[in-house]
Swiss-Prot record:
UniProt-recorded name of the protein: Phosphoribosylformylglycinamidine synthase subunit PurL
Protein encoded by which gene: purL
Catalytic activity reported: N(2)-formyl-N(1)-(5-phospho-beta-D-ribosyl)glycinamide + L-glutamine + ATP + H2O = 2-formamido-N(1)-(5-O-phospho-beta-D-ribosyl)acetamidine + L-glutamate + ADP + phosphate + H(+)
Function (record text): Part of the phosphoribosylformylglycinamidine synthase complex involved in the purines biosynthetic pathway. Catalyzes the ATP-dependent conversion of formylglycinamide ribonucleotide (FGAR) and glutamine to yield formylglycinamidine ribonucleotide (FGAM) and glutamate. The FGAM synthase complex is composed of three subunits. PurQ produces an ammonia molecule by converting glutamine to glutamate. PurL transfers the ammonia molecule to FGAR to form FGAM in an ATP-dependent manner.
Subunit organization: Monomer. Part of the FGAM synthase complex composed of 1 PurL, 1 PurQ and 2 PurS subunits.
Keywords: ATP-binding, Cytoplasm, Ligase, Magnesium, Metal-binding, Nucleotide-binding, Purine biosynthesis
Entries under CDD domains matching the protein: PurL_repeat1, PurL_repeat2
Pfam families: AIRS, AIRS_C, FGAR-AT_linker
Transmembrane segments: none
Main location: cytoplasm
Length: 714
């Protein structure tokens, strides 16, 4: 049980009595960090959540934002870190299942999945095992339910060796007049439970996710990992949409963490209503299940529909059509109480608000020691450094991952994995760019700046496709919030993210917090995973690859002597230290807005765009050459900024920078850019040249490809 002594005392005072064992179990689940957000809620208030086009913000199963006059997009993101550490294949697969149900609950058809994954270095056998089976779990589940996995990111670092991070984002489309909510507003309506049968898997899943892992977790906590079934999920999806199309439902919610206890209490508490639940009506997968097990089970592929009693027969007929178990398991009441009955007796009677809205905890925050200066190193040859960066699993091609995913099912994917963002077709004219990004090293060494920079990088990725950000979702992965240094990291990171979002006027419409990512005293690098959706006309998509020889290369944004916390230091020198790049909120916005303006004004004259992030300008230009097979000549002295040597010029990770190629006259474009910028080179030839240093594009290609494949074949 994760209830603290003070929480138990609070509960006794609210009830005027001691809870019985079932009630204790229900309260334990709902007071868990995973369900209650009791530590994070005060901090999450920093986020801007309202803005043009926002239909539903935080607080429901997913956020919803307007995309066209008729269509909206539901977007959510979730973590499945602890389950994936224990059972990587099943943990990752059920993570996909959970986020799909969140999108379906809004009435939206899922059209895209994205994943953000973090593991230990691939030299470690256990890390390779976790990586292999997490990717297979994602691909098997996503491919079988027919939802494309279109983009993502992967990071490898020692701090994720014992505690991998598995975050999944999903986007879906829904007509604006068909959006559903997770509410139960009408007393007298009934709860229709449909989908998978309820078993013993996943019991205590949310409390398991609200504690640190230990050396014995792999054995002791395996029953807390849910068991997914993608075939049943496919049937649940189809049946759900048919029910929502044919029957007026007043509320829809999936059964995820906390099972029936969480789902029903949240449905009714939002409307100040109550619920009566009959355990005998619930379709079970196993015999002899206790009320405690039934109410806390997190068995997968289950949905609750709130509807009028006179529409039950129609809904049941649809469920029979798809061979799905279904039953009316209770009703909405006006009592404000969550009542559970078994064999005609009341066995639990709790205020719904007490379950769904536990009190917050004001955590202590303490600033840890952080680096204040740059790290002095002896720089190797430029060619050696660039090739080593390109052959690092953190930068090298992720083709081993995305080739396992079906990214073209549904035939919406316009720009496929491997670019700055994926682009999907919404209608004949409109597309959405989707990305997910994070910089855990910057956040570890400067939480405020790293949080802001993670939002900035995600926005740069959609801007580089020709889109403008509509909304942000986030998945915040941190250690134990009871430790003051960890909570300070979390608070400062959220402040930085919120400030960057506010600068762009881009609302945060949904999110997830995953605490307790610690094992045996090793805390993960704080990882604020940021998903961004941007809208763009389908006829103005940009991609990163060079398009032709003889085009001018422009850099937007200043490059500074900021090698601290860089991929260059981590990969080439084995150092994770130094002050990360500064975050200039206004400069980040001005650079993005300048890119938007020149795309709008000059259109096809802008032939390629790529953001600068891990590895700096050197890696960014190399990736553009590798993607196209076209070389380039770069004059590093023309790069705008204040660096002191070529390694700083090429590998600093200063924020707010883009690389563009343009055709025709460049002067007019430069004049339009009211930010630091310069023409730094020209495309052409079979080599990438930085001043008098040259590398054949074929050599860059070979360094960049086959890296992860080589590790995974050992």
């Amino acid at each position: 049980m994760v209830l603290t002594d003070s929480e138990i005392e609070f509960i006794r005072k609210e009830l005027g009595r001691d809870p019985n064992p079932l009630e204790y179990g229900m309260l334990d689940v709902m007071f868990s960090e995973h369900c209650s957000y009791k530590s994070s809620r005060p901090v999450l208030g920093f986020f801007p959540t309202e803005g043009e086009g926002v239909i539903i913000g935080p607080g429901d199963d997913a956020g919803v934002v307007e995309v066209t006059d008729e269509l909206a997009m539901a977007i959510g993101i979730e973590s499945h870190n602890h389950p994936s550490a224990i059972e990587p294949y099943g943990g990752a697969g059920t993570g996909i299942g959970g986020i799909l149900r969140d999108i379906i609950s809004m009435g939206a058809m899922p059209i895209a999945l994205l994943d953000s994954l973090r593991f230990g270095y691939l030299e470690d056998q256990k890390s390779r095992y976790l990586f292999e089976h997490v990717v297979k779990g994602i691909s098997d589940y996503g491919n079988r339910v027919g939802v494309p996995t279109v983009a993502g990111e992967v990071e490898f670092d020692d701090n994720f060796q014992l505690n991998p991070l598995v975050n999944v984002m999903c986007a879906g489309l829904v007509r604006k007049d068909e959006i559903k909510r997770g509410i139960a507003p009408r007393p007298g309506d009934v709860f229709l439970l449909m989908g998978g049968r309820t078993g013993r898997d996943g019991i205590h899943g949310v409390t398991f996710a609200s504690e640190e892992l230990t050396s014995s977790s792999e054995l002791e906590d395996r029953p807390a990992v849910q068991v997914g079934d993608p075939f049943t999920k496919k049937m649940v999806m189809e049946a759900s949409f048919e029910i929502m199309e044919k029957i007026e439902v007043s509320g829809v919610k999936d059964l995820g963490g906390g099972g029936l206890t969480c789902c029903i209490s949240e449905l009714v508490a939002k409307c100040d209503n109550g619920a009566r639940v009959n355990l005998e009506a619930i379709p079970l997968r196993e015999e002899g299940m206790t009320p405690y097990e039934i109410m806390l089970s997190e068995s997968q592929e289950r949905m609750i529909f709130v509807l009028s009693p006179d529409r039950v027969d129609e809904a049941m007929e649809i469920c029979r059509k798809y061979e799905l178990p279904a039953a009316v398991i209770g009703e909405v009441t006006d009592t404000g109480r969550m009542i559970v009955e078994s064999e005609g007796k009341v066995i639990a009677d709790l205020p719904a608000k007490l379950l769904a809205d536990p009190p917050v905890i004001e955590r202590e925050a303490k600033k840890p020691d952080l680096p204040e200066g740059q790290v002095e190193v002896q720089h190797p040859l430029l060619t050696e450094a660039l090739l080593k960066l390109l052959s690092s699993p953190n930068i090298a091609s992720k083709r081993w991952v995305y080739r396992q995913y079906d990214h073209e099912v549904q035939i919406r994917t316009v720009v496929k994995p491997g670019d700055d963002a994926a682009v999907l077709r919404v209608d004949e004219k409109t597309g959405v760019a989707l990305t997910v990004d994070c910089n855990s090293i910057h956040t570890k060494l400067d939480p405020y700046g790293g949080g802001a920079a993670s939002v900035g990088e995600a926005i740069r990725n959609v801007v580089s496709m020709g889109a403008w950000p509509l909304c942000i979702v986030d998945c915040l992965n941190f250690g134990n919030p009871e430790k003051p240094e960890v909570f300070w990291q979390f608070r400062e990171c959220v402040r930085g993210m919120a400030d960057m979002a506010e600068t762009f006027g881009t609302p945060v419409i949904s999110g997830n917090v995953s605490f307790y990512n610690e094992t045996e005293g090793v805390t993960v690098n704080p990882s604020p995973v940021v998903g961004v959706a941007g809208r763009l006309p389908l006829d103005s998509i940009k991609t990163m690859d060079f398009k032709a020889e003889g085009e001018k290369i422009i850099v937007i944004g200043d490059t500074k002597p900021e090698l601290g916390a860089s991929e260059y230091l981590r990969t080439v020198h084995g150092i994770v230290d130094g002050k990360p790049p500064e975050t200039d909120l206004r400069a980040e916005f001005d650079a993005a807005n300048s890119v938007r303006r020149i795309i709008e004004r000059f259109g096809d004259k802008v032939t390629a765009i790529h953001d600068c992030s891990a590895g700096g300008i050197g890696v960014a230009v190399a990736e553009m050459a590798i993607k196209s097979g076209i070389g380039a000549t770069i004059d590093t002295g023309k790069i705008p900024g204040s660096f002191s040597n070529i390694h700083e010029a090429l590998f600093s990770e200063s924020n707010g920078r883009y690389i563009l190629t343009v055709t025709g006259s460049v002067e007019e474009i430069i004049q339009e850019l009211e930010v630091p910028c310069a023409v730094i080179g020209t495309t052409g030839g079979g080599a990438l040249k930085f001043d008098d240093v040259a590398l054949d594009v074929s050599e860059l290609y070979d360094a960049y490809h086959g890296v992860i494949e080589a590790y995974m074949s050992t």
